[in-house]
Amino acid sequence: MGVTMRDLGKRLGVSAVTISKALSGKSGVSEEMRQRIIRLADELGYVNPNTAQNKDKGMDIGILVPERFFSNDTFYAMFYKQLLQVMAENGHFGLLELINGEMQKSLTLPNLLRSRRVDALILLGQLTEDYARLIAEQGLPTVALDFHCPVIPMDAVVSDSVLGAAEMTRHLIDAGHRDIGFLGNVKATSSIMERYLGFASEMLRNDLPIRPECVLPDRTDDNIVTLPALPKKLPTAFVCNCDVVARPFIEHLRAAGVRVPEDVSIVSYDDFNNAPGSLPLTTYRVDTEAMCRIAVQRVTERSRGDEQPPCRIVVGGQSVLRDSVSPV
């Protein structure tokens, strides 16, 4: 494994960010420290992947995806394909690596970083806070896509989960629903937490109570998808945190003798996986293409020396009204 910025930082007692600034000629590092870093880098044979002569050329961008989110028929597989297309249009090359649970627990760096094969990183999908911090400490231009870690200084591009879930909840209220539940483990990802907040804010705005027994988990805290036990008294509607869990939940309700949408209405989020023959879902469509373009643009700007404070870019979507809601 080659020498990393983190290795240099450990030797000198500074952060990988300081190493990155020193080697790229950025401000924020004393001249004495800059020279110490340069000397140590030369001594250890460190090779900087973001040298000036590469700034106007296409980059090799690593795409790190938690393994549990990725398969050929998932939302993130579609996201990944769109990322590759945007990268190709901009002269960049994308390299995928799946991050399994053991790597996150043991804080094992991805092979793409250990082999120094990439110039920048896009993190697609929620990583643990400790693992995201480890990645950020490596000093490469990095953007989180479809999640964010508030305590880690890192650019993030996310959909407008709060607004989208609020719009879906409002549609149910406008249809006469007053007893509304939520499907999603709010501790599992930042997106689910924000969608719950959007749902809860709209319920509060309309002076409607939320029954705790009707806030159902769709997965474990480790993101293993599960089907929840149903409450004895069902609400008349559910806001589901995403389409991928909404569909099996509908089948779960039907298996219990519940008609959808006649007995229980369903709204969801993402506008993904509307298979022919299945119930057309009322959902909030995420503009994944815009999110990919912004993420690639942001990581490119960072690689070219943008030193603005980390930002969180929120991308809007639109409500798509279909057949999964019945009026009360």
Region locations from a protein language model:
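N-terminal helix-turn-helix DNA-binding module of bacterial transcription factors
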Residues: M1-K57
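Alpha-helical recognition/docking segments in bacterial nutrient-uptake
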Residues: G58-R170, P228-K233, A237
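Short beta-strand elements in bilobed, periplasmic/extracellular small-molecule ligand-binding domains
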Residues: M87-I99, Y196, A200-D221
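Hydrophobic alpha-helical segments within soluble ligand-binding/sensing domains
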Residues: V157-F182, T220-L227, A246, V286-R304
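An alpha-beta-alpha
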Residues: M168-D207, C311-S326
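Short acidic capping loops at alpha-helix termini that bridge into adjacent secondary structure
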Residues: R178-D179, I210-E213, V260-I266
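Flexible loop/turn connectors
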Residues: T226-V328
